[in-house]
Amino acid sequence: DRLAALRPAAPDFALMWDNAYCLHEVYGQFVPFRDMLTLCREAGNADMVYEFASTSKITFPGAGVAVMAASEANLKYLSGLLGAQTISYDKVNQLRHVRFLQDKAHVLELMQRHAAILRPKFEAVLAALRGIAPLGIASWTEPKGGYFVSCDAMPGTAKRTLALCAEAGVTMTP
């Protein structure tokens, strides 16, 4: 609600809403995020937000189908830009996705299969972090969805923490 109600000083301020993990539940059933487009419209900021998502972490990394949502005015503006930049979209890839994903029920079922694969990995990471909890050297999130655990180490330890993770074969996003 706070983001939607922003009153930016700059008239061209834009909220680029990355909704990449909108379907990525690791625990439980699908719970949709609040609709940022509607929240912004209701707050009088319909033209402030551009929302993006894709199927790249659902189907093929780097080869998914991207989507964008915005107000009618912003879509009209962007259509003019994209029309000059893009000759044609990859219609074969779009068709491949439509045939594979089919509908919302099939997408949600696929995401449950993804969650079954990822859940043990999340549990292993969280178990290791819980093991160091008594030391008080870090704090972390325990997400219900998405594909990231955010870990905050003690000040001044980031480089060494990243080096130790790399030695253990764990990839961290600094």
Segments and roles (model prediction):
Residues 1-61:
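Active-site pre-lysine segment of PLP-dependent enzymes
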Residues 17, 97, 172-174:
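Hydrophobic residues in well-ordered beta-strands that form the structural core
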Residues 31-35, 68-69, 166-167:
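Glycine-rich, phosphate-binding/catalytic loops in enzymes
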Residues 75, 79, 150-174:
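Conserved C-terminal alpha-helix-loop-beta "cap" of PLP-dependent enzymes
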